[in-house]
C-alpha cells in the first residue's frame, strides 16, 4: 500500500484539478484490507483536501471486513465511507473451498451484516459459472439464500472466463476442472435471480455475459426472468460459446 505521504501528495494534485470533487474511489486491488487506523487517516486527508466530498468507496474482500468492529465501521461511515464493492463470488461452500477463497457462507453473512449495521452501502459480485459443470444450481441457491438475509445495493453478475494465463486454465486442460456450459450458466443465473427476495439492483451487463441484463428487484424480476427464458430457449450452446472465446479481456 502507498505510504500516507504519497496519498497526501496525490490529494494535493487532485485538489488542483478537481477541488469540488464529490465522489472519491480508492483504487489498487482491495484497499479495504488496510487497517481501521490507516483508513481513518486517509479519510481525514480526504476531508482536508476535498471538503466537498460526499462519499468515498473502494474494493473489498469479505475477509477485509473481519478485523473491523461495527463501531469502527460506523466511524468510517461517519467519515463518509459509503460504497464498498465486495467480491463475494458465491456463497456455495464447496465452490469457495475448491477455489481457496478463504471464507465460507457463514463468513459472508456475518461480515456483510456488520456493514448493514454500520449503515455502509455495498455492492456484491456474483461470479456465474465459478463452480464448474453441474454446480451452478447449488451455487445459485446457496448464494440467494445468504443474500436474502442482507441488503446489497447492487448485485453485479459476471461470468467466469478462463484465460490461458490463469492457473485454472491448466486445470481445464488436464481435466481436473470442467467449465460450466453456457446454457447451464443461463439456467444458473435464472435460478439465482428467481430466488432473490430482497430489494436490490441487478447489473448483469458485463462483457463476460453474452446475454446482458439489468433491472431493479423486485419490480423488474419477472421481466429479467422472461429475457433469460427466451435466451435459454433460442440461443444454441455453440453461439454462446463462440461469444465466450471471443472475449479477450475483462
Question: What residue ranges belong to the model's regions?
Answer:
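Auxiliary Fe-S-binding modules of radical SAM enzymes
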Residues: 148-250
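Conserved, mostly hydrophobic/aromatic
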Residues: 26, 58, 86, 124, ...
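Catalytic cores of alpha/beta
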Residues: 68-73, 131-149
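Conserved strand-turn element in the central/C-terminal portion of the radical SAM core barrel
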Residues: 63, 91-95, 115-139, 158-164, ...
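Canonical Radical SAM [4Fe-4S] cluster-binding loop centered on the CxxxCxxC motif
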Residues: 1-9
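Hydrophobic anchor at the start of a short beta-strand
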Residues: 56, 122, 200
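Conserved SAM/AdoMet-binding glycine-rich loop
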Residues: 16-117
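Aromatic/hydrophobic pocket-lining residues that form the small-molecule binding cavity
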Residues: 7, 39, 69, 108-109, ...
Amino acid at each position: 500500500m502507498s505510504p500516507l505521504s504519497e496519498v497526501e501528495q496525490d490529494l494535493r494534485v487532485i485538489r488542483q484539478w478537481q477541488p469540488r470533487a464529490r465522489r472519491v474511489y480508492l483504487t489498487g486491488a482491495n484497499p479495504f484490507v488496510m487497517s481501521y487506523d490507516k483508513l481513518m487517516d486517509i479519510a481525514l486527508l480526504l476531508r482536508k483536501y476535498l471538503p466537498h466530498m460526499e462519499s468515498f468507496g473502494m474494493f473489498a474482500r469479505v475477509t477485509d471486513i473481519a478485523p473491523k468492529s461495527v463501531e469502527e465501521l460506523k466511524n468510517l461511515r461517519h467519515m463518509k465511507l459509503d460504497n464498498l464493492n465486495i467480491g463475494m463470488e458465491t456463497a456455495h461452500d464447496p465452490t469457495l473451498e475448491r477455489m481457496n477463497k478463504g471464507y465460507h457462507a457463514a463468513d459472508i453473512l456475518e461480515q456483510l451484516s456488520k456493514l448493514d449495521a454500520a449503515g455502509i452501502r455495498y455492492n456484491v459480485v456474483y461470479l456465474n459459472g465459478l463452480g464448474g459443470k453441474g454446480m451452478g444450481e447449488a451455487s445459485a441457491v446457496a448464494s440467494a439464500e445468504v443474500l436474502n438475509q442482507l441488503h446489497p445495493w447492487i448485485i453485479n453478475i459476471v461470468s467466469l472466463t478462463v484465460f490461458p494465463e490463469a492457473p485454472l486454465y491448466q486445470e481445464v486442460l488436464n481435466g481436473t476442472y470442467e467449465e460450466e456450459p453456457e446454457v447451464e450458466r443461463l439456467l444458473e443465473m435464472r435460478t439465482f435471480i428467481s430466488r432473490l427476495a430482497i430489494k436490490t439492483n441487478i447489473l448483469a451487463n458485463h462483457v463476460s455475459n453474452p446475454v446482458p441484463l439489468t433491472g431493479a428487484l423486485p419490480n423488474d424480476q419477472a421481466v429479467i426472468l422472461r429475457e433469460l427464458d427466451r435466451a435459454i430457449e433460442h440461443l444454441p450452446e455453440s453461439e454462446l460459446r463462440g461469444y465466450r472465446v471471443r472475449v479477450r479481456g475483462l
